[in-house]
Amino acid sequence: VLSRGLGDVYKRQVFKSYSDKIFEIGLTPNRCDAISHFGVSRDLRAAISYRKDKQIDLISPSISNFHNTIISPNLNIDISDSKDCRRFCGLIINNIEIKDSPDFIKNRLNAIGINPINNIVDITNYVMHELGQPLHAYDRNKIKSNTIKIQKFSNPKKFITLDGEERDLTNDDLMICDDNTPMCIAGIYGGLNHSVTDDTTTIFLESANFDPVTIRKSSKHHLLNTDSSYRFERGVDLDNTEFALKRAAALIIEHCNGEIISDLMDEYPGKIDEKNIVLNFNNVDKLIGFKIDKLKIKSILNLLDFKINNVTDISAGITIPNYRHDVNRECDVIEEILRIHGYNNIEIDKKLNISISSLTNFNNKYQNLISDYLSSLGFNEIMNNSLVGEKLSQNDNKVILLNSLSSDISCLLYTSDAADES
């Protein structure tokens, strides 16, 4: 019980409380552009601006604090295969003070189920959820060479991850290396020997873009499903790599007393061409089923950051933003137009003609009759899972799943006839 002599201000400092509303959004795997607060805001801005017929500005996070004083020489970035690593950016930040994060960062992380650790780790997590770009920080003083290599090893190696577990690397694992010493499983999990600790004063901050297939293979092989791998597996925006790094660095300068002492290193071998699609206005009407005014179509496309080129009476050339990996065809563009226009605005005839075909599969008919007869006699039907645990499988030639969800469902269940024949 607090003394009555304590003022209200002190009580508020002791009992800090706030209310919040958390929205959980179920995303399909193809909507990698919306796996961030900024990405969701971008979509909401488009829908609300169109449906409310008013312009809403989308405000990007501030990087006004970003500035560097070049003291330290840059590290060399060596990417062995541009398919595996399309872009790699980095900064060296000095005078870091490891401490608790400010309340606004801790509150944001707690709200989305992430436990705050320290200001550096928290800022990388904060920016990842804010912008959708995973980041990783290394202790610069533990990097012994002047070259960061992004490569796969041809020979097996041992690697200790942040959780203290020693893992066997395969030749499919893409690694971030201190010359030839592995520091991190790229896009998935960091290493213990180069991690940030309470004694860290200088960090190398990484922002990169990795091949989704490569990341998924390693993630499933090592059973490491992280927030970082979740995003890389679905595809991360190449154009956002540098901005996210600057955003994190600006927060580190502001809240960790950091000082950037290098150039922004940017190795970009995997540049991609713009996607251009021709949109036929007649096809919009045919596919949707009713006519949408051309001015409304253009408004929707502009709100979605689709650049409109070469407009004629019957068609328009569309340039798709790089962060929209799911839009590759004309029908995808039409789907986006309808999504923002509103599925609820689809005009439906009042009369619906529904035809139900008669039952023609006689096998099912007799099976149902027999089932009804047997159940009336007190029999019970058993529908077994087609998967069982390895211990329960009595067959010597058991078929084992390579990546089962559980040890209890790791083998295919043989029928009694198949088991007898084998």
Predicted regions and their residues:
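RNA/tRNA-interacting regions in translation and RNA-turnover enzymes
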Residues: 3-363, 368-370
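Hydrophobic pocket-lining residues within nucleotide cofactor-binding pockets
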Residues: 98, 210, 387, 418-419
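Polar, glycine-rich mid-to-C-terminal structural blocks
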Residues: 354-359, 366-416
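Single conserved hydrophobic/aromatic residue that forms the stacking wall/gate
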Residues: 1-10, 414-422
